[in-house]
């Protein structure tokens, strides 16, 4: 992924961000974003060690990607999302699972999440992934509305899990 500078309009000023792939030194900031995300999602409990381990595994994987939105003025990571590669028999090839799309609360509603999502789609297309899918908390109406506005559609599938 090439670094892409973007300008987003905030309430009172312009914010310069760059979109890039995550690096190991980002992990503490990514863990903080996941802490914020997991307060919204009912199915997950925050555990700093587990989240750091998971992020490290994703960063080491050659077939997966973590994207970040970084504030250029102070190198603060404002947002993130991850794409993990899976094999789909329905598609006859690789597909992607988009996870952990989060923008820090103070920077929401400024287009950063949409830019991360577009970059994730671009990355998936470059990898030859045949489909992208995601799971969202059914009670997180702002997230569901956001994804629908970005052209994502609900399916008839229901997520089940066994711990």
Residue ranges and their predicted role:
Residues 1-25:
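Conserved N-terminal entry element of GNAT/NAT acetyltransferase domains
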Residues 17, 21-27, 32-93, 99, ...:
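Acetyl-CoA-dependent GNAT
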Residues 76, 114, 138-156, 162:
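Conserved active-site alpha-helix within GNAT-family acetyltransferase domains
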Residues 86, 104, 137:
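Residue-level recognition of the GNAT/N-acetyltransferase active site
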Residues 103, 109-122, 149:
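Conserved acetyl-CoA-binding loop-helix of GNAT-fold acetyltransferases
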Residues 124-135:
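Conserved GNAT acetyl-CoA-binding A-motif
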């Amino acid at each position: 992924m090439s670094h892409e500078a973007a300008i987003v309009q905030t309430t009172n000023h312009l914010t310069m961000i760059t979109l890039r792939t995550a690096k190991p030194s980002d992990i503490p900031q990514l863990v903080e974003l996941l802490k914020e995300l997991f307060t919204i999602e009912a199915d997950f409990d925050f555990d700093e060690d587990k989240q750091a381990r998971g992020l490290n595994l994703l960063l080491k994987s050659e077939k997966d990607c973590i994207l970040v939105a970084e504030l250029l003025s102070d190198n603060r990571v404002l947002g993130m999302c991850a794409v993990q590669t899976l094999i789909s028999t329905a598609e006859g090839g690789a597909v992607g699972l988009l996870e952990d799309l989060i923008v820090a609360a103070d920077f929401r509603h400024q287009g950063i999440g949409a830019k991360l999502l577009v970059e994730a789609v671009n990355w998936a297309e470059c990898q030859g992934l045949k489909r992208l899918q995601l799971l969202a908390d059914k009670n997180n109406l702002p997230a569901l509305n956001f994804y629908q506005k970005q052209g994502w559609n609900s399916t008839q599938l229901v997520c089940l899990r066994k711990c």
